[in-house]
């Protein structure tokens, strides 16, 4: 039976996060590197592709036996969940990760914030000439929250728990890494909370859903 599981939760930003958007039409005096925003609301967003790519990169470091120059060279377990365009071995991704829009705008504004982002001034110094190169980086503020929404297609019950454990491992590793750019300078530390899975298409036994949620609950432990 065609079955899909929805995994929901919250991504909480613990340190200022920068996922870059376009500055092609920035006015004079505007920030050098703006964050990506939803065009309708103007709220900061996390593209699903950014989260999926980061998850896969971390899993590749942990699970691949050697350095993979291309995603198609990832181990079979990763390709099974995230997909592969390898010639002769094409695999459809089992997960769909939706774009995530800032969800706690009212809470942030009630804390006295006039803006949903902050601008951090940074500087690089040329060691040879001592010439400074200042720049302005826009960041999503600490305390921002984004609603996580992932759909997982059940293709093989025999590896269902193994696939969910892979996703949970990616969440765990990301909490000790960073999302977006400039992680080495303290940007982009995040936390996953309120993870919950339910069947939205087809049917699974309650015991199966309970086991999936047990696996996901270990992410925040």
Model feature map: region roles:
Residues 1-125, 129-221:
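RNA-binding basic/glycine-rich loop and surface signature characteristic of RAMP-family CRISPR effectors
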């Amino acid at each position: 039976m065609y079955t899909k599981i929805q995994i929901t939760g919250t991504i909480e930003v613990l340190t200022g996060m920068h996922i870059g958007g376009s500055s092609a039409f920035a006015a004079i005096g505007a920030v050098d590197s703006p964050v990506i925003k939803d065009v309708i609301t103007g709220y900061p967003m996390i593209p699903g592709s950014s989260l999926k790519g980061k998850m896969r990169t971390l899993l590749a470091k942990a699970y691949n036996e050697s350095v993979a120059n291309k995603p198609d060279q990832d181990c079979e377990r990763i390709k099974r969940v995230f997909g592969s365009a390898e010639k002769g071995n094409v695999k459809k991704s089992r997960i769909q990760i939706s774009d995530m829009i800032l969800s706690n705008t009212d809470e942030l504004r009630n804390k006295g914030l006039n803006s949903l982002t902050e601008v951090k001034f940074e500087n690089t110094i040329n060691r040879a000439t001592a010439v400074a190169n200042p720049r302005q980086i826009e960041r999503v503020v600490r305390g921002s929250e984004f609603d996580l929404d992932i759909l997982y297609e059940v293709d093989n019950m025999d590896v269902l728990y193994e696939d969910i454990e892979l996703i949970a491992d990616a969440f765990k590793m990301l909490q000790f890494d960073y999302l977006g750019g400039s992680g080495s300078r303290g940007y982009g530390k995040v936390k996953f909370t309120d993870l919950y899975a339910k069947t939205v298409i087809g049917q699974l036994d309650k015991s199966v859903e309970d086991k999936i949620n047990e696996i996901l609950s270990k992410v925040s432990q």
